[in-house]
């Protein structure tokens, strides 16, 4: 069984850690340069900022590897994001677990649904396990609001969420 647009963003194993050590090493050794990095899409920056902090500008310094081809050339499976700090860049893998997972989820949503890389005439199934994991309850509520608004705009989208939270 094949699903287009499959993304697994596990917290403890799986794709999240495939690139973690590689990205740190590539950045530390100067392999990842300013030419390889660009500002993130406004959608991802603003949604991440709002969901986690209640404003749309908190992650103004968020960057990402320019494209999949550059990431693949570096041996990376994903397109990592970076936050600008006084001391340089911090990869999403060194940010909080909630930030890291939400960046990956928003990247997927933006590319698959907003930019429409997935077909609009076929059903899209999105499964999000333990949506509350590593997120503040207010952030979970804001994320669910975003998912609801996306579902209203995309009739072919079905989303299933799981939670172990009593809230």
Where do the PLM segments sit?
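Extreme N-terminal leader/anchor segments
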Residues: 1-16
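N-terminal/domain-start segments enriched in small and hydrophobic, helix-friendly residues
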Residues: 5, 9, 40, 160
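Extended helical coiled-coil dimerization/tether regions that scaffold
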Residues: 17-100, 107-117
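Switch/communication elements of ASCE P-loop NTPase nucleotide-binding domains
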Residues: 93-167
């Amino acid at each position: 069984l094949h699903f287009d647009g499959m993304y697994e963003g596990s917290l403890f194993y799986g794709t999240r850690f495939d690139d973690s050590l590689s990205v740190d090493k590539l950045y530390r050794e100067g392999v990842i340069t300013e030419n390889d990095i660009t500002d993130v899409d406004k959608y991802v920056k603003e949604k991440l900022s709002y969901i986690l902090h209640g404003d749309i500008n908190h992650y103004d310094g968020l960057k990402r590897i320019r494209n999949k081809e550059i990431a693949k050339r570096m041996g990376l499976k994903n397109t990592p994001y970076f936050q600008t700090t006084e001391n340089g860049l911090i990869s999403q893998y060194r940010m909080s677990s909630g930030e890291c997972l939400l960046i990956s989820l928003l990247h997927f949503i933006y590319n698959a649904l907003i930019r429409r890389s997935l077909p609009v005439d076929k059903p899209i199934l999105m499964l999000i396990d333990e949506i509350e994991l590593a997120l503040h309850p207010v952030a979970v509520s804001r994320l669910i609001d975003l998912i609801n608004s996306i579902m209203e705009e995309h009739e072919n989208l079905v989303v299933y969420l799981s939670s172990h939270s009593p809230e």
